Amino acid sequence: MSKKQNGYDDSRRYFLKSSALAAIGASAVTLTLPLRASGSSTTMRLKVTGYDYDRVAALATGKVKIEGCDLEFTPGKIGEMNNEAFGGSQTFDISEIGLIPFILAYANDDFRDYTLLPVFPLRVFRHKSIFIRTDREINKPEDLRGKTIATPGYSSTSLTWIRGLMQDEYGISPSDIQWVTSGKDSSADISGTVSGYENLIPDGLNVKTGSPDKDESDLLESGEVDALFHAIQPRGFIQGHPKIARLFPDSRAAEQTYFEKTGIFPIMHAVAIRKSLLDENPWLAQAVFNAYSQAKQLTYKKMLAMGWAYDALPWYGQELEATQAIMGNNFYSYGLEPNRKTVETLCRYAFEQGLSKRLLKVEELFSPEGLAFVEEV
C-alpha cells in the first residue's frame, strides 16, 4: 500500500521493543499504527468492557492508549457481557465476548451488531475441566461413555471445547452421555449468569434439568451424577471431597500432549467492536488491535523481568520458561492466521454438536479490516 491511500497514512511503524526486553531474551513485536483520516483532530470516546486480566490491565488503567481515543473501561463478567451485547442495551463500543455465543448468534440469528477483532483475551486448555466421582469406575476418558454428566448450562465455549476434544481425541459423542444441566452455578459470582446462547440444547440428546436448588458441585458431591464438565473448579474439588477428582490426574501433561499434537490453544473469549462504529471509522480496527497487543507485550515484559516477585507461585520463572519452550515466546498470540486452526475447530464443533445451523467460515466472524492483522514477532 502506498504511503497515503484512501485518506489514511500508514507510514509510521510502532515498535514494541525495549532494551530490557532484548536483554532478557523476549521477542519484540512490531505493529503498524494507523493514523486517523487526514485532517481529523477529534478524540473519540470509547466505552470498553472486559475482565481486567494482566494482559489487558495496561489498557484498562490507561497506561496503554487506543490511538485517537479516550477510553472508559468497565470490568465485567462474561455472562453479563454476552447478554448486554446480544440482547441488552449495547452500551459498550468494545466488549469481551464468548466465542461460542458469538458464533451461535451470528449463524443462527443473523447477529451483525458487533464484529470480532482477532484479539483473544482468554484461552484455556480444558482437560483440567473434567471432574469425576472416583467410585464410578471411571479411569480413562472412554469410561465416560454411558455415564451421567452435569454441566452448568450446555452451550458455553468451555463446554463446547470439552465435548469436542472428547469426540476428536477419544471418540466419545455427546449422544453417548446422559446430560444433567444444573439449576444453579456455583461460579456465578465470577462468570455471571449463564447467558442465553450458553444454554442452548440441541435436539436428539438425553438431557434433563437438575434440582433447581442444587448447583453443579452439589450434584457431583451427592452422587446424582458420575462426572462434571465445568470451566471453573467446583466447590467439592476445591474443598477436597474424598470422592471427587480430575479425570486426568496429570492434566498438565495431557494438555501439553494435546497442544503438541494439534497446535491448538483453545480460545474462550474474543474482542468484539460495534460494527456501525467501525463502518464509520475503519482505522479504529487496527488501533484497537494494536492497543490490546501492546498491553499484552507489557505483561510479557513484566513476567520475564519481575513476574516472580509479583506472583506468589514459588517456581513462577521456571513455569514461564517451560511454557515458552513448548509454545514459543508469544504463546498468547493475537491475529487470525496463527489462530486460524483453533477458530476453525471451534466453528466445526459448534456445527457438529448441533449448536449452529451452519458451518461458518472463520472470515465471516471478523471485521474485513482485521483479517490481515499480525503481530510481527
PLM regions and their residue ranges:
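N-terminal secretory signal peptides
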Residues: M1-Y14
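C-terminal segment of N-terminal export signals and the immediately downstream linker at the start
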Residues: Y8, L31-T49
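N-terminal export signals
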Residues: Y14-R36
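Short helix-initiation/N-cap motifs at beta->coil->alpha
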Residues: T74-A85, I177-D218, E364-L371
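Pocket-lining segment of extracytoplasmic ligand-binding domains
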Residues: I190-L304
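Secondary-structure end/capping motifs
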Residues: A272, L277-E352
